[in-house]
Amino acid sequence: MRTKSTGKKKINVITLGCSKNVYDSEVLMGQLKANGKEVVHEQSGEIVVINTCGFIDNAKEESVDTILDYVQRKVDGLVEKVFVTGCLSERYKPDLIEQIPNVDQYFGTRELPLLLKALGADYKHELVGERLTTTPRHYAYLKIAEGCDRPCSFCAIPLMRGGNVSRPIEDLVTEATKLAKNGTKELILIAQDLTYYGLDIYKKRELATLLRELVKIEGIEWIRLHYAFPAGFPEDVLDVIREEPKVCNYIDIPLQHISTKLLKSMRRGTTHEKTNALLDAMRTKVPDMAIRTTLICGYPGETEEDFQEMKAWVQEQKFDRLGCFTYSHEENTHAYNLEDDVPEEVKQQRVEEIMEIQSQISYDLNQEKIGKQFRVMIDRKEGENFIGRTEYDSPDVDNEVLISAIDTYLPVGDFVNVEIIEAYEFDLIGKVID
């Protein structure tokens, strides 16, 4: 039976998961647009591409539910074709083909040319930086590397994304320059591990060099670093953060735990003492650095003593931003060979205890901001307020600054000077300073 052509059909790209998936979808849509395809962001598309996440159980469930939803729409005649790509498809393709056969085709994370061909398009290698961005115009993600070479015992990312592949500095500068010409003011650098950047193609860590090139781009005002790895952290990056005004005094560095015993089992390449030494170095070199981290509760073998050690450490370190998650026992990871011996209710209780501590820390730190002035980027208008961020806050995950829109107009994407007049756990209230 002949398959209908995808030539003039509207294509709806649905993105699930993290910022790396957002970036990948933007690249896909940019390629489709360059091929003359019509990309839509509503449910009217005749062709649906689902970019899935396969990181932990909740993400996998959301991806499977979304696939099943659109397969049913296909059965009901509401869409013509359903294609699936991304991490879930990379990790479980044979199982998905067997269990959800009504999907037209599955693609892995490194099969963009094949996906484009199925959509009636050709992959154009020369289109460096040609993305159809889905973030607000004034900020954009810049993925500097794909994959990961780290051996973390709990993580399935290398199974889905492969080993680390850095992108050449010149390609990244070209892409960032195009973004700036289109109105982007903030670059959010992402990778599975920013600090590994360059080791594969330059034989040394080159994140600092990349940053010094990116700050030269006219129009870029903020450069933000997401997802650094603590072991082997290149401290020359701290010099760049301190010296270059465009590089935000902010870093997202998932630390996962502080028990040396568990860090060893996690294969993180660090210890309690080395972790604290790195944090001390960060705060010494960049005194007003905002540090965001992520922790795991309930890793195999985590005792009450290990947990109490982490609680005390969180109280001691007073991280500016912190997220905490329960351990997910992922097949084909090194930790899957260990007994998942912490009950789910204990994992969840530990997460809640950590987040209760962090909520108080966040409130106390925000209270200290009252009366101080900050440069704020306006992200959007919401009801009777404009919503913005300081350089110490990343979109969607950190503090927001609310500024009354009554008798005030603030263009989205503009910077304004703001004095903080009220503060809560995760929100700041400010007024514009002339």
Segments from the language model and where they lie:
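Radical SAM/AdoMet-radical enzyme domain recognition
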Residues: K181, A208-T209, K216-I223, P234-L295
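Proteins enriched for Cys/Gly/acidic motifs involved in redox and nucleic-acid/cofactor modification
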Residues: M1-Y197, D236, V247, I251, ...
